[in-house]
From Swiss-Prot:
GO cellular component, one term: mismatch repair complex
Described function: This protein is involved in the repair of mismatches in DNA. It is required for dam-dependent methyl-directed DNA mismatch repair. May act as a 'molecular matchmaker', a protein that promotes the formation of a stable complex between two or more DNA-binding proteins in an ATP-dependent manner without itself being part of a final effector complex.
GO BP term (any one): mismatch repair
The protein's name in its UniProt record: DNA mismatch repair protein MutL
Pfam families recorded: DNA_mis_repair (PF01119), HATPase_c_3 (PF13589), MutL_C (PF08676)
Record keywords, A-Z: DNA damage, DNA repair
Any GO molecular function: ATP-dependent DNA damage sensor activity
Family the entry assigns: Belongs to the DNA mismatch repair MutL/HexB family.
Provenance organism: Salmonella paratyphi A (strain AKU_12601)
SUPFAM superfamilies: ATPase domain of HSP90 chaperone/DNA topoisomerase II/histidine kinase, DNA mismatch repair protein MutL, Ribosomal protein S5 domain 2-like
Length: 618
């Protein structure tokens, strides 16, 4: 057979073997094109797992009429124009072969309009030579791509496609990965006319964690340790699950991004695994969602047909940087215990059918006994000495010798905790007996404490503790039961025999707390909850409450109310002055006993006089 130039369609079909592996590959390429076009909303419509229809609609910048034909041609792109551009890629796509490859194995239609155009235009390629036809169309600013009958002209490829459910699961996973990469973009995924996933654009860190919980699940979010690590041009952000509490289900969560591009890189995985190896079992894997930012000139993304792998120019530096970042946050994790009465935690195991009962990850349950904060980087700047990045006195231009003995005595007196006679419960110094106010809120400290001024004294008040006491007061019935709020959609859960027996035994007490339910042979249906629980994630809170009740031998409304108050999720991860003032007003009204005799952990006096005396000594 003589050497000859292959027809365009055959050449594109050969190229499609690398680019278009399955419907999920098509979705990935097209959604990434939408993101490169600056879209803030992308709608993905799928029919029959992508075999019948894949429609991607965005609100990006659109494509000009005169460029539509080029968009469907091989090796035509707006992402790069020279070798220098290729060596510093910042876009997701750059080869200019995706649309041509997809159109060669499907019936592809491209409709687009730019903001400067008065009307939209539609293009499609057909025939052996892949001739492009362009005609007018109706369309808003942005682009819509329709891929019909994928692999209709390549029966061998179509024969290797899996079931509709399997193919859609691969598409769903691709959208999950993209949603974790771009929190600023709204993504809507529909299958056979039904909306399956809806990820709204978010900007604030708290909202990002809600999307993280929606994608990775509440168990991962509960164990996630935040990472913020930087050295030179390298930055590592994201979350890694505490290896001490990593389960088999969590090990499937391994998402890594390099400059916003989803990756499956062995070097990155090895660095993370090495950092966690002391706390992981032989058959365990770390769970993480990490974002690595690096100078584009220091990484080559053009080494894999599907762009799943990269090559770092300084691979050892990148490996050690990731290793140090993950290891540091694991070493710096801390645990603090709430000052309320200790109660045995509810069992964490939840049956699969209970998880499937309307799971809503956008409301994350509070962790009652553990608080984790982002680790402070010790590997910054160019520091590589043995002090772990800590600044020594010799590094400051005006460093002075240590304080003198007299100053030390003053400081020790300031920092010393006053000794008191033993008591069953630690009680903070009470305010005046006739006072019914905590005082005036001066400012918010560290986002969760209020600095108060009252009768010439300064107090530091824990807002989360005050909120828990308020919730407990709101949930504790007085002369009449707590008002029940009917649920628009009752929550139906499967329960064991022991759980059902515990619920029936505590039904009257739960009714006083505003929790109403009905039970049958193997299920319980929650029909009403008190007002403080309406905004909570009941799919998580109620099963944990049932587990707690199943562990108890006797029941009391005050104990149940206290357990609920400890386990509800605060609505204020960061408190403002107005929120703090409103909270204290409610506490003073509903919990006047806290003003007269504050419990331990609520108020801490600040000794300004000792501080002023310390400043006066030289």
């Amino acid at each position: 057979m003589p050497i000859q130039v292959l027809p365009p369609q055959l050449a594109n079909q050969i190229a499609a073997g690398e680019v278009v592996e399955r419907p999920a590959s098509v979705v990935k390429e097209l959604v990434e094109n939408s993101l490169d076009a600056g879209a803030t909303r992308v709608d993905i419509d799928i029919e029959r797992g992508g075999a019948k229809l894949i429609r991607i609609r965005d609100n990006g910048c659109g494509i000009k009429k005169e460029e539509l034909a080029l968009a469907l041609a091989r090796h035509a792109t707006s992402k790069i124009a020279s070798l220098d551009d290729l060596e510093a890629i910042i876009s997701l796509g750059f080869r200019g072969e995706a649309l041509a490859s997809i159109s060669s194995v499907s019936r592809l239609t491209l409709t687009s309009r730019t903001a400067e155009q008065a009307e939209a235009w539609q293009a499609y390629a057909e025939g052996r030579d892949m001739d492009v036809t362009v005609k007018p169309a109706a369309h808003p600013v942005g682009t819509t791509l329709e891929v019909l009958d994928l692999f209709y002209n390549t029966p061998a490829r179509r024969k290797f496609m899996r079931t509709e459910k399997t193919e859609f699961n691969h598409i769903d996973e691709i959208i999950r990965r993209i949603a974790l990469a771009r929190f600023d973009v709204t993504l809507n995924l529909s299958h056979n006319g039904k909306l399956v996933r809806q990820y709204r654009a978010v900007a604030k860190d708290g909202q990002k964690e809600r999307r993280l919980g929606a994608i990775c699940g509440t168990p991962f979010l509960e164990q996630a340790l935040a990472i913020e690590w930087q050295h030179g041009d390298l930055t590592l952000r994201g979350w890694v699950a505490d290896p001490n509490h990593t389960t088999t289900a969590l090990t499937e969560i391994q998402y890594c991004y390099v400059n916003g591009r989803m990756m499956r890189d062995r070097l990155i995985n090895h660095a993370i695994r090495q950092a966690c190896e002391d706390k992981l079992g032989a058959d365990q894997q770390p769970a993480f969602v990490l974002y690595l930012e690096i100078d584009p000139h220091q990484v080559d993304v053009n080494v894999h047909p599907a762009k799943h792998e990269v090559r770092f120019h300084q691979s050892r530096l990148v490996h050690d940087f990731i290793y140090q970042g993950v290891l540091s946050v694991l070493q710096q994790q801390t645990e603090t215990t709430l000052p309320l009465e200790e109660i045995a935690p509810a069992p964490r195991h939840v049956p699969e059918n209970r998880i499937a009962a309307g799971r809503n990850h956008f409301a994350v349950p509070a962790e009652p006994t553990t608080a984790r904060e982002p680790a402070t980087p010790r590997y910054s700047g160019g520091a590589s000495g043995g002090n772990g990045g800590r600044q020594t006195a010799g590094g400051w231009p005006h460093a002075q010798p240590g304080y003198q003995k007299q100053q030390g005595e003053v400081y020790r007196a300031l920092l010393q905790t006053p000794t008191t006679s033993p008591a069953p419960e630690a009680v903070a110094p009470a305010l005046d007996g006739h006072s019914q106010s905590f005082g005036r809120v001066l400012t918010i400290v560290c986002g969760d404490c209020a600095l108060l001024e009252h009768a010439g004294t300064i107090q530091l008040l824990s807002l989360p503790v005050a909120e828990r006491w308020l919730r407990q007061a709101q949930l504790t019935p007085g002369q009449s039961p707590v008002c029940a709020q009917p649920l628009l959609i009752p929550l139906r859960l499967k329960v064991s025999a022991d759980e059902k027996a515990a619920l029936q035994k505590a039904q009257s007490l739960l009714g006083e707390l505003g929790i109403e339910f009905q039970s049958d042979a193997q299920h319980v249906t929650i029909r009403a909850v008190p007002l403080p629980l309406r905004q909570q994630n009941l799919q998580i809170l109620i099963p944990e409450l049932i587990g707690y009740l199943a562990q108890q031998t006797t029941f009391a409304t005050v104990n149940i109310a206290q357990w609920i108050a400890r386990n509800v999720q605060s609505e204020h991860p960061q408190w403002s002055m107005a929120q703090a003032i409103s909270l204290l007003a409610d506490v003073e009204r509903l919990c006047p006993q806290l003003v007269k005799a504050p419990p331990g952990g609520l108020l801490q006096p600040v000794d300004l006089h000792s501080a002023m005396n310390a400043l006066k000594h030289e």
